[in-house]
């Protein structure tokens, strides 16, 4: 499931790769440049942190946020194993980010925002932490007309689906938060007829 990374994960710690549960590569289309500050929401074991660290170089900075102490520890261990000095992992929730306002160039997230029941708060937080002209690039799951019985199914919720909203709702939420130039860059069909869409969603502030 690292097909979207095209060599970008070569040489990275196996623990980061084996515990990557994303649904895409949020950096695949990103114009991340050396010196940029990148924030990864729900960094997990850290695979996207490490890919981002390579892109921003020594002059840049990468911040990962995850809500579980276990994943924060694992991500820190993988960062240390990979030898990056420009990556910091913080424990926190995406609805209330432990990140200064106007401090990051890029917000990335891989299959996480769909799990939040308070997406408007997440989108508002993204808008808050981005610098003027900063950008967001997300791989996430969107659905069309998810039946209530499925939405209530906690097993599906845990596997990234029942918390998802429609593409239109997702994009509207980003716009309400004050983000502009909101667009879907690529769509991948996924699962059955009731679970049709993963979109890489890109926009900038």
Residue ranges and their predicted role:
Residues 171, 179-191:
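Conserved S-adenosyl-L-methionine
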Residues 33-96, 121:
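Class I SAM-dependent methyltransferase SAM/SAH-binding core
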Residues 2-37, 51, 55:
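Conserved alpha-helix/loop element of class I SAM-dependent methyltransferases that forms part
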Residues 162-178:
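Short alpha-helix
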């Amino acid at each position: 499931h690292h097909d979207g990374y095209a060599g970008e994960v070569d040489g990275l710690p196996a623990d980061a790769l084996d515990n990557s549960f994303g649904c895409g590569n949020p950096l695949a289309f990103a114009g991340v440049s050396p010196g940029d500050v990148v924030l990864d929401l729900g960094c997990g074991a850290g695979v996207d942190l490490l890919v981002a660290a390579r892109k921003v170089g020594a002059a840049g900075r990468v911040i990962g946020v995850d809500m579980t102490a276990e994943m924060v520890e694992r991500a820190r261990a993988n960062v240390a194993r990979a030898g990056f000095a420009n990556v910091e992992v913080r424990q926190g929730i995406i609805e209330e980010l432990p990140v200064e306002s106007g401090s990051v160039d890029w917000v990335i997230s891989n299959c996480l925002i769909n799990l939040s029941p308070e997406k408007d708060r997440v989108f508002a937080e993204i808008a808050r932490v981005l610098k003027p002209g900063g950008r967001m690039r997300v791989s996430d799951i969107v659905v069309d007309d998810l039946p209530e019985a499925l939405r209530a199914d906690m097993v599906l919720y845990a596997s990234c689906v029942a918390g998802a909203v429609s593409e239109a709702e997702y994009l509207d939420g980003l716009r309400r938060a004050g983000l502009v130039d909101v667009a879907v860059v690529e769509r991948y069909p996924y699962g059955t007829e009731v679970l049709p869409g993963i979109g890489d969603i890109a926009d900038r502030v």
